[in-house]
């Protein structure tokens, strides 16, 4: 099973920084600029790809889970490493997302999305990629093993980083743009308070 995790920081400061870097204010054509529903395609998100994965474990219900400090920090060098942000992804046996948790002092989880290929789509993709290797004259059948027919999941997290002073970015914004900005921040705060 392949799991890809992408984290999008929805903090409005990134959109404001982009506007200043491009030496332009938000235009009327740029409607989703401060919209909470905007995706990375409009450039309003700061995308991060977690790569410092220390350990992955499977919880087997038949075994006693070791919850000691040594087990929970396996693979972490006490002197050189310090965990800053932890994303816990719980998948069931079929690879479907059961739960996701973000433990962080710098970020709060707003929402998450999954985009999983079904088993049939994975099988078709695998068969078509291996189809060139087999000739039609051979009567061999492709065996179904767990390595070749796995479920691939893309998990996207929308997070919000700590609010910061935006006053240097706000000087050239119109009243309409300021209203959109504060509406977006209020929606984000409402999502956070609803999750508590």
Swiss-Prot record:
Subcellular compartments: Cytoplasm, Cytoskeleton; Preautophagosomal structure
Misc. remarks from the entry: Present with 486 molecules/cell in log phase SD medium.
Protein's GO biological process: autophagosome assembly; autophagy; autophagy of mitochondrion; chromosome segregation; karyogamy; nucleophagy; piecemeal microautophagy of the nucleus; protein transport
Organism: Saccharomyces cerevisiae (strain ATCC 204508 / S288c)
Pfam families from the UniProt entry: ATG31
Keyword Cytoplasm attached: yes
Effects seen without this gene: Decreases the percentage of cells having vacuolar ATG8, impairs ATG9 recycling between the PAS and the cytoplasmic pool, and reduces autophagy by about 60%.
Assembly description: Forms a stable complex with ATG17 and ATG29. Interacts directly with ATG29. The ATG17-ATG29-ATG31 complex interacts with the ATG1-ATG13 complex. Note=The interaction with the ATG1-ATG13 complex is induced by starvation.
Cellular component GO terms, alphabetical: Atg1/ULK1 kinase complex; cytoplasm; cytosol; microtubule; phagophore assembly site; protein-containing complex
Disordered: region residues: 20-45, 120-145
UniProt protein name: Autophagy-related protein 31
Keywords: Autophagy, Chromosome partition, Cytoplasm, Cytoskeleton, Karyogamy, Microtubule, Phosphoprotein, Protein transport, Transport
Protein task: Plays a role in starvation-induced autophagy. Involved in mitophagy. Functions with ATG17 and ATG29 at the preautophagosomal structure (PAS) in order to form normal autophagosomes under starvation conditions. May be involved in microtubule function, such as chromosome segregation and karyogamy.
Keyword Phosphoprotein: yes
Domain of life (superkingdom): Eukaryota
Modified residues (Phosphothreonine): 41
Location of Phosphoserine modifications: 38, 40, 44, 116, 135, 143, 146, 153, 174, 195
Post-translational modification: Highly phosphorylated. Ser-174 is phosphorylated constitutively. Phosphorylation at Ser-174 is required for autophagy induced by various autophagy stimuli such as nitrogen starvation and rapamycin treatment.
Biased composition (Polar residues): 22-43, 120-129
Biased composition (Acidic residues): 135-144
């Amino acid at each position: 099973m392949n799991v890809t995790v992408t984290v999008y920081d929805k903090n409005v400061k990134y959109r404001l920084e982009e506007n200043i870097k491009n030496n332009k204010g938000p235009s009327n054509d740029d409607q989703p600029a401060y919209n909470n529903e905007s995706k990375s395609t409009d450039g309003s998100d700061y995308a991060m790809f977690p790569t410092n994965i220390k350990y992955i474990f499977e919880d087997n219900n038949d075994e006693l889970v070791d919850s000691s400090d040594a087990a929970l920090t396996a693979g972490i060098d006490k002197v050189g490493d310090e965990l800053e942000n932890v994303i816990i992804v719980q998948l069931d046996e079929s690879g479907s997302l059961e739960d996701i948790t973000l433990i962080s002092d710098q970020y709060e989880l707003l929402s998450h999305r999954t985009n999983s290929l079904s088993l049939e789509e994975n099988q078709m993709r695998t068969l078509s990629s291996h189809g060139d290797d087999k000739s039609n004259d051979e009567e061999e059948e492709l065996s179904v093993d767990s390595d070749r027919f796995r479920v691939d999941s893309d998990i996207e997290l929308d997070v919000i980083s700590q609010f910061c002073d935006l006053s240097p970015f706000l000087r050239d914004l119109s009243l309409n743009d300021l209203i959109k900005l504060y509406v977006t921040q209020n929606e984000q705060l409402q999502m956070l308070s609803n999750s508590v």
